[in-house]
Amino acid sequence: MILDGKGLAARRLELLKEDIIEGGLSPTLATVIVGDDPASHMYVRMKHRACEQVGISSVNISLPEDTTTRTILERIRQLNEDPDIDGILVQLPLPKSIDTEAVLAAILPEKDVDGFHPLNMGRLVTGLPGPRPCTPNGIMTLLHENKISIAGKRAVVVGRSVDVGRPIALLLLHADATVTMCHSKTENLKEITKQADILVSAAGKAGIITADMVKPGATVVDVGTNQVNGKLCGDVAFDEVEKIAGAITPVPGGVGPMTIASLMENTADIARNRCGHFM
């Protein structure tokens, strides 16, 4: 079974558009991007198109590559204090000269649509309500909507990034999966992944997951976005793994669209909460 993130995301965005209209909301998302990385600018454009689609206003602050941390912090302070801005997103990765942790921590937790503020990460760890990181949240929605059983299953996450690997492991744990995390120092990776009922790869390395690493019938979630010979591909060797997996996400068209949908939902939720219309 192909887990169609593109189709599901489109349906969820249409429902969100209706909710925004019926709720009389007028959410506004501010994005901050630093530098000229083509991929980052492409992702920001996609997010703004989604905003337009569902009725969320958006503003983009584009800063040059040589911008200082202090300058970014000042722009974030202004956005924090702006009553018309509901959500703030800083497009990652930032240039190496920027203190990314300081930048993310400067965003007001109640305007943090990405869920990366330390307070919101703490809420994720403890299971308290709060905005969840968009890619992991999108993955969980994709699994739930496709009736993929999680409770009691063995889940393996390849990759320990703060934005995907660690939070998806926590969300799976909260859903009562038995979770194992793997990373660049993990020994016997194949032996571990082959035990997984649910295998999530967020390693950022094209083709790292091959058919001999996958348990027959497993659900395989490919978070990778890699460029190989000018073509977008994931971490999973799709053609061979699809033959033995019970369910698998394609790249493109799997996790990516769900990430965008989750961002839009987070923005609308934050706008509701700031207006006092708690869900």
Swiss-Prot record:
Record keyword NADP present: yes
Sections of the chain in a coiled coil: none
Matching CDD domains: NAD_bind_m-THF_DH_Cyclohyd
Keywords: Amino-acid biosynthesis, Histidine biosynthesis, Hydrolase, Methionine biosynthesis, Multifunctional enzyme, NADP, One-carbon metabolism, Oxidoreductase, Purine biosynthesis
EC number: 1.5.1.5, 3.5.4.9
Catalytic activity: (6R)-5,10-methylene-5,6,7,8-tetrahydrofolate + NADP(+) = (6R)-5,10-methenyltetrahydrofolate + NADPH; (6R)-5,10-methenyltetrahydrofolate + H2O = (6R)-10-formyltetrahydrofolate + H(+)
GO biological process, one term: tetrahydrofolate interconversion
GO cellular component: cytosol
Binding site for NADP(+): G159, R160, S161, S184, T225
Entry's Gene Ontology molecular function annotations: methenyltetrahydrofolate cyclohydrolase activity; methylenetetrahydrofolate dehydrogenase (NADP+) activity
Pathway assignment: One-carbon metabolism; tetrahydrofolate interconversion
Source organism superkingdom: Archaea
Record-linked NCBIfam families: PRK14178.1, PRK14186.1
Subunit structure: Homodimer.
Function noted in UniProt: Catalyzes the oxidation of 5,10-methylenetetrahydrofolate to 5,10-methenyltetrahydrofolate and then the hydrolysis of 5,10-methenyltetrahydrofolate to 10-formyltetrahydrofolate.
Family named by the database record: Belongs to the tetrahydrofolate dehydrogenase/cyclohydrolase family.
Name the UniProt record assigns to this protein: Bifunctional protein FolD
Species, as recorded: Methanospirillum hungatei JF-1 (strain ATCC 27890 / DSM 864 / NBRC 100397 / JF-1)
Gene name of the encoded protein: folD
